[in-house]
Amino acid sequence: MEEIKVHIGKTVALMNDNIDTDQIIPKSFLKRIERTGFGEFLFDSWRYLPNRKPNPDFPLNASDRQEATILITGDNFGCGSSREHAAWALLDYRFRVIIAGSYSDIFYMNCTKNGVLPIVLPKDAREKLAEIAADEDVTIDLPNQQVISSVGTYPFEIDATWKNKFINGLDDIAITFEHIDAIKAYEQKVDSI
């Protein structure tokens, strides 16, 4: 997993509440097992018109938002069916940070396990961040747990374990390898019984 200590990026806002995983990545695009190649289908039914041309009214299609790496959104983001592909699609599109009012528990875990930092902020903070100009950077300071912008600095909470994983770029396998000596000692002990 790629580490995130301080992320500086552009934003795009999609302020809908209850965006479910089928809206994030429709099930018709889940036929591959690789974690890449899903970004082009992110929010597919909203991003594209029936003729597959980009919907000019959809925020991600705005020419001045093409560099966005931070998605600002509503409450209950990632609800619906458990679908790890949704986190893969967000990351493959280039989002490293999602700022929402709340998340589905499973979706939150899928994000953290796949290198997408899910941040929870109240509605008033998200509404202010949503108004930031397209060419303006927002800073995510994970060690100090702050979202820093021209419209304000907003503290956020994150579990210490997840914070450590993001700051050090550790996934579950990397953490397991940190304990490899203890695992080998245990295996030798069990084998000797």
Curated annotation (Swiss-Prot):
Heterodimer of LeuC and LeuD. GO terms for biological process: L-leucine biosynthetic process. It catalyses: (2R,3S)-3-isopropylmalate = (2S)-2-isopropylmalate. Belongs to the LeuD family. LeuD type 1 subfamily. GO terms for cellular component: 3-isopropylmalate dehydratase complex. Pathway: Amino-acid biosynthesis; L-leucine biosynthesis; L-leucine from 3-methyl-2-oxobutanoate: step 2/4. One of its GO terms (molecular function) is 3-isopropylmalate dehydratase activity. It comes from Listeria welshimeri serovar 6b (strain ATCC 35897 / DSM 20650 / CCUG 15529 / CIP 8149 / NCTC 11857 / SLCC 5334 / V8). Pfam families: Aconitase_C. SUPFAM superfamilies: LeuD/IlvD-like. Its EC number is 4.2.1.33. It comes from the Bacteria. This is 3-isopropylmalate dehydratase small subunit. Keywords: Amino-acid biosynthesis, Branched-chain amino acid biosynthesis, Leucine biosynthesis, Lyase. The lineage of its organism: Bacteria, Bacillati, Bacillota, Bacilli, Bacillales. Catalyzes the isomerization between 2-isopropylmalate and 3-isopropylmalate, via the formation of 2-isopropylmaleate.
